[in-house]
Amino acid sequence: MKLFGWMQNKLNGKQGNKKPNTVPITTHPAKQEPREEFSDWPHGLLAIGTFGNNDLKENAAESQDIQEDPTSSEEILDNFTPEEVGKLHKELTKLLTRKPNIEKEIADLPLDRFLNCPSSLEVDRRNSNALCSDSADDHKDEDIEKTISVILGRCKEICGDKNKKAIGKKSISFLLKKMFVCRSGFAPQPSLRDTLQESRMEKLLRVMLNKKIINPQGSSRAASMKKYLEDRQIPTKKESNTEDDTKEKINNGCKWVKTDSEYIVLEI
């Protein structure tokens, strides 16, 4: 507005310089013309971006009319009786309560059922989730059973070790009685060498028995061979004895006997 006043003053000043006598006559219409020209500018500025809607003026006029006539609404309300107002209130409540029923009826339509029904992928996903939950429960049960079996096995091992160490659990009095009453005392534990030797001897005896049982002819042949060898060795011994006797006789054929005076040869 200051800009407009400054422009008007400029225009009025120029006209005043040209026509000093007509200044009071031209001042009033010059001020009124720009007001009429720029009176529509606020509505035009507000209408920018509304694609040329000119309803702003009409809406502003209607709002002004409503503000100017507040008595019209009061007159309309005065025309209704309290009974009519109560009936309207009841009807409004009925309409409001019917809305959810209408929504249910719309949802029951076949098209809505088709659109709202779960897809096959969703059904598969639900089934897979259910199966996964069942499998997880099964795995938990299996883990529990495994832990129980491990615990039982460990308990059995501990019990076996305790049974093996029964002597260590006996009381000192029992051990002393056993040592003093029994002369032999505790039997010594067999060494590894004895066990190995016994096992080897047992194997040899088994082999010998098997041979005797399976090959009795072989054993008889061996006995006959021993007898034959013994018979051959006996005559050889006799022959050697005779040879020794002959040698002694030859050597003892003549002997020198020494006396005080001379040697005498004795012939045998």
Swiss-Prot record:
Top-level taxon in the UniProt lineage: Eukaryota
Chain intervals with Low complexity compositional bias: 11-21
Keywords: Growth regulation
Region (Disordered) location: 11-39, 220-246
Motif (IGT motif): 44-50
Tissue: Expressed in roots.
GO process terms (BP): positive gravitropism; regulation of growth
Cytoplasm as UniProt keyword: no
Chain intervals with Basic and acidic residues compositional bias: 30-39, 227-246
InterPro entries in alphabetical order: LAZY
Other known facts: Plants overexpressing DRO1 exhibit increased length and density of roots, and increased biomass of shoots.
Functional note: Involved in the development of the root system architecture by influencing lateral root angles and primary root length.
Family the entry assigns: Belongs to the LAZY family.
Record-given protein name: Protein DEEPER ROOTING 1
Organism annotation: Prunus persica
